[in-house]
Curated annotation (Swiss-Prot):
This is S-adenosylmethionine decarboxylase proenzyme. Competitively inhibited by methylglyoxal bis-guanylhydrazone. Irreversibly inhibited by NaBH(4) in vitro. Keywords: Autocatalytic cleavage, Decarboxylase, Lyase, Polyamine biosynthesis, Pyruvate, S-adenosyl-L-methionine, Schiff base, Spermidine biosynthesis, Zymogen. A chimeric protein containing the beta subunit of SSO0536 and the alpha subunit of SSO0585 (SpeH) has ArgDC activity and no AdoMetDC activity, implicating residues responsible for substrate specificity in the beta subunit. But additional factors in the alpha subunit are required for efficient cleavage and turnover. It holds the Pfam family AdoMet_dc. It comes from Saccharolobus solfataricus (strain ATCC 35092 / DSM 1617 / JCM 11322 / P2) (Sulfolobus solfataricus). Heterotetramer of two alpha and two beta chains arranged as a dimer of alpha/beta heterodimers.
Length: 124
């Protein structure tokens, strides 16, 4: 296992940006159609290609999963706490999961958030 090593020429590219969003706009967190639209726009901003989007209303919250050609984007919401989790993962060297993540943060109206980045690339 190589920890903390950046690969110069990975054969498999994997970039993941994920985090927790706090003090979000409660109305947006409840709105399935709006969340789907936000994911579509985020994918465009991150230069990703959406294959399919599925959503589920769970109580007041919503889970939205977008399968992108390059991997996935997810948003899970808890409006009663004004809280959401977001995960943007891409295997495309031409993509920007960070730009997509930042767009989602902005559109959910998060007053504060955590952000984590993982390089999941491999040289094989």
């Amino acid at each position: 296992m190589m920890m903390g090593v950046e690969l110069a020429f990975p054969k498999v590219v994997g970039k993941q940006v994920y985090g927790s969003l706090y003090e979000c706009d409660e109305d947006v967190l409840k709105d399935t159609k709006r969340l789907e639209q936000i994911i579509k726009e985020a994918a465009d901003i991150g230069n990703m290609n959406i294959l399919d989007i599925k959503s589920w209303k769970i109580g007041e919250g919503v889970s939205v999963v977008a399968i992108i050609l390059e991997s996935h984007i997810t948003i899970h919401t808890w409006p009663e706490y004004r809280f959401a989790t977001v995960d943007v993962y891409s295997c495309g060297p031409h993509t920007s999961p960070l730009n997509a993540f930042r767009y989602i943060v902005e559109k959910l109206g998060a007053k504060r958030y955590t952000i984590n980045e993982a390089d999941r690339s491999s040289e094989f």
